Amino acid sequence: GCHVNGLVAHENGSQPDSLWVARRARTKPTYPGKLDHLVAGGLGHGEQPGENVLKECAEEASIPREVAIQARPASIVQCCKADETRWGVKQETLFCYDLLLPCDFKPVAADGEVESFELWEIPQVIDSLAADNDDWKPNVALVIIDMLIRRGFLAPEDDGYVELVRALRR
Protein backbone atom coordinates (compact mmCIF):
# COMPACT_ATOMS: atom_id res chain seq x y z
CA GLY A 1 0.00 0.00 0.00
CA CYS A 2 0.88 3.68 -0.11
CA HIS A 3 1.23 5.90 2.96
CA VAL A 4 1.56 9.69 2.99
CA ASN A 5 3.14 11.57 5.89
CA GLY A 6 1.32 14.92 5.73
CA LEU A 7 3.91 17.28 7.19
CA VAL A 8 3.74 20.99 8.03
CA ALA A 9 6.63 23.40 8.64
CA HIS A 10 5.37 26.48 10.48
CA GLU A 11 8.58 28.39 9.75
CA ASN A 12 9.28 28.84 6.05
CA GLY A 13 12.08 26.58 4.85
CA SER A 14 12.52 24.85 8.18
CA GLN A 15 12.30 21.22 9.20
CA PRO A 16 8.63 20.14 9.43
CA ASP A 17 7.35 20.41 12.99
CA SER A 18 3.88 18.88 12.71
CA LEU A 19 2.12 15.87 11.21
CA TRP A 20 -1.50 15.50 10.16
CA VAL A 21 -3.06 12.50 11.92
CA ALA A 22 -6.35 10.89 10.94
CA ARG A 23 -8.68 8.97 13.24
CA ARG A 24 -10.28 6.11 11.34
CA ALA A 25 -14.06 5.95 11.27
CA ARG A 26 -15.45 3.72 14.00
CA THR A 27 -17.57 2.03 11.33
CA LYS A 28 -14.50 0.74 9.43
CA PRO A 29 -14.27 -3.06 9.56
CA THR A 30 -10.49 -2.96 10.09
CA TYR A 31 -8.84 -0.98 12.89
CA PRO A 32 -11.93 1.14 13.69
CA GLY A 33 -11.14 4.31 15.63
CA LYS A 34 -7.35 3.85 15.35
CA LEU A 35 -4.94 6.66 14.52
CA ASP A 36 -3.86 6.64 10.88
CA HIS A 37 -2.02 8.60 8.22
CA LEU A 38 -3.49 11.64 6.56
CA VAL A 39 -3.69 9.44 3.46
CA ALA A 40 -3.08 5.71 3.03
CA GLY A 41 -4.51 3.13 0.72
CA GLY A 42 -4.06 -0.29 -0.74
CA LEU A 43 -2.29 -0.64 -4.05
CA GLY A 44 -4.32 -2.47 -6.69
CA HIS A 45 -2.72 -5.01 -9.04
CA GLY A 46 -0.85 -3.13 -11.75
CA GLU A 47 -1.47 0.24 -10.11
CA GLN A 48 1.53 2.54 -9.80
CA PRO A 49 2.27 3.96 -6.32
CA GLY A 50 2.42 7.58 -7.50
CA GLU A 51 -0.99 7.40 -9.18
CA ASN A 52 -2.42 5.65 -6.11
CA VAL A 53 -1.17 8.50 -3.90
CA LEU A 54 -2.89 11.11 -6.08
CA LYS A 55 -6.16 9.14 -6.07
CA GLU A 56 -6.09 8.52 -2.31
CA CYS A 57 -5.19 12.15 -1.54
CA ALA A 58 -8.35 13.29 -3.33
CA GLU A 59 -10.58 10.53 -1.95
CA GLU A 60 -9.49 10.49 1.69
CA ALA A 61 -8.51 14.07 2.52
CA SER A 62 -9.74 16.28 -0.36
CA ILE A 63 -6.16 17.27 -1.20
CA PRO A 64 -6.14 19.10 -4.54
CA ARG A 65 -4.10 17.44 -7.28
CA GLU A 66 -1.78 20.46 -7.57
CA VAL A 67 -0.83 19.94 -3.90
CA ALA A 68 -0.82 16.12 -3.99
CA ILE A 69 1.67 15.99 -6.88
CA GLN A 70 4.24 17.43 -4.47
CA ALA A 71 4.24 14.17 -2.47
CA ARG A 72 7.73 12.70 -2.69
CA PRO A 73 8.62 9.00 -2.51
CA ALA A 74 10.78 8.71 0.59
CA SER A 75 11.18 5.08 1.60
CA ILE A 76 9.83 1.55 1.54
CA VAL A 77 8.93 -0.31 4.72
CA GLN A 78 8.38 -4.06 4.65
CA CYS A 79 6.48 -5.87 7.37
CA CYS A 80 4.41 -8.97 8.04
CA LYS A 81 0.92 -9.15 9.45
CA ALA A 82 -1.41 -11.92 10.46
CA ASP A 83 -3.86 -12.83 7.72
CA GLU A 84 -6.83 -14.79 9.04
CA THR A 85 -8.26 -15.29 5.54
CA ARG A 86 -5.12 -17.06 4.33
CA TRP A 87 -4.27 -18.97 7.52
CA GLY A 88 -0.98 -17.34 8.11
CA VAL A 89 1.17 -14.32 7.56
CA LYS A 90 1.02 -11.75 4.77
CA GLN A 91 4.08 -9.78 3.64
CA GLU A 92 3.35 -6.07 3.14
CA THR A 93 5.37 -3.58 1.12
CA LEU A 94 4.55 -0.02 2.16
CA PHE A 95 5.49 2.79 -0.21
CA CYS A 96 6.21 5.81 1.99
CA TYR A 97 5.69 9.36 0.74
CA ASP A 98 6.30 12.71 2.44
CA LEU A 99 4.05 15.62 1.52
CA LEU A 100 4.87 19.08 2.85
CA LEU A 101 1.56 20.90 3.21
CA PRO A 102 0.87 24.63 3.56
CA CYS A 103 0.26 25.86 7.12
CA ASP A 104 -3.28 26.93 6.22
CA PHE A 105 -4.25 23.58 4.64
CA LYS A 106 -7.09 21.74 6.38
CA PRO A 107 -7.92 18.20 5.20
CA VAL A 108 -11.56 17.29 4.71
CA ALA A 109 -12.74 13.68 4.97
CA ALA A 110 -14.27 12.84 1.61
CA ASP A 111 -15.01 9.11 1.59
CA GLY A 112 -16.37 8.34 5.07
CA GLU A 113 -13.28 6.38 6.11
CA VAL A 114 -11.99 9.09 8.47
CA GLU A 115 -13.73 10.38 11.59
CA SER A 116 -11.45 13.39 12.07
CA PHE A 117 -8.09 14.97 11.29
CA GLU A 118 -5.78 16.63 13.81
CA LEU A 119 -2.49 18.45 13.34
CA TRP A 120 -0.04 17.06 15.92
CA GLU A 121 3.34 18.50 16.81
CA ILE A 122 6.14 15.98 16.24
CA PRO A 123 6.95 15.55 19.98
CA GLN A 124 3.28 14.61 20.58
CA VAL A 125 3.52 12.00 17.79
CA ILE A 126 6.71 10.55 19.31
CA ASP A 127 5.18 10.45 22.81
CA SER A 128 2.06 8.71 21.52
CA LEU A 129 4.06 6.07 19.64
CA ALA A 130 6.38 5.53 22.62
CA ALA A 131 3.39 5.04 24.94
CA ASP A 132 2.68 1.81 23.01
CA ASN A 133 -0.99 2.00 23.95
CA ASP A 134 -2.40 0.41 20.78
CA ASP A 135 -3.86 3.72 19.53
CA TRP A 136 -2.18 3.47 16.12
CA LYS A 137 -2.89 1.22 13.16
CA PRO A 138 0.24 -0.99 13.29
CA ASN A 139 1.64 -0.45 9.80
CA VAL A 140 1.10 3.30 10.14
CA ALA A 141 3.25 3.38 13.27
CA LEU A 142 6.06 1.71 11.31
CA VAL A 143 5.90 4.25 8.48
CA ILE A 144 5.87 7.17 10.92
CA ILE A 145 8.86 5.75 12.82
CA ASP A 146 10.66 5.42 9.48
CA MET A 147 9.94 9.12 8.75
CA LEU A 148 11.08 10.18 12.25
CA ILE A 149 14.40 8.38 11.69
CA ARG A 150 14.90 9.66 8.12
CA ARG A 151 14.22 13.27 9.11
CA GLY A 152 16.38 13.17 12.24
CA PHE A 153 13.64 13.46 14.86
CA LEU A 154 15.05 10.28 16.37
CA ALA A 155 18.82 10.08 16.74
CA PRO A 156 21.48 7.50 17.67
CA GLU A 157 21.75 9.15 21.09
CA ASP A 158 18.12 8.30 21.91
CA ASP A 159 17.46 5.27 24.10
CA GLY A 160 16.62 2.23 22.00
CA TYR A 161 17.50 3.89 18.68
CA VAL A 162 19.74 1.11 17.36
CA GLU A 163 17.25 -1.60 18.29
CA LEU A 164 14.40 0.38 16.72
CA VAL A 165 16.27 0.89 13.44
CA ARG A 166 17.38 -2.74 13.39
CA ALA A 167 13.80 -3.97 13.90
CA LEU A 168 12.44 -1.62 11.24
CA ARG A 169 15.05 -2.65 8.65
CA ARG A 170 14.75 -6.45 9.08
Predicted regions and their residues:
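Acidic, metal-coordinating catalytic segment for phosphate/diphosphate chemistry
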Residues: 1-15
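Terminal peptide-recognition signature
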Residues: 4, 57, 97
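Conserved beta-strand and immediately adjacent loop positions that scaffold enzyme active sites
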Residues: 3, 18, 116
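Nudix hydrolase/Nudix homology domain
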Residues: 27, 31, 82-84, 90-170
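Short acidic alpha-helical/loop segments enriched in Asp/Glu that coordinate divalent cations
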Residues: 66-74, 107-111
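Conserved Nudix-box catalytic region and its N-terminal flanking loop in Nudix hydrolases
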Residues: 15-59, 63, 73-80, 102, ...
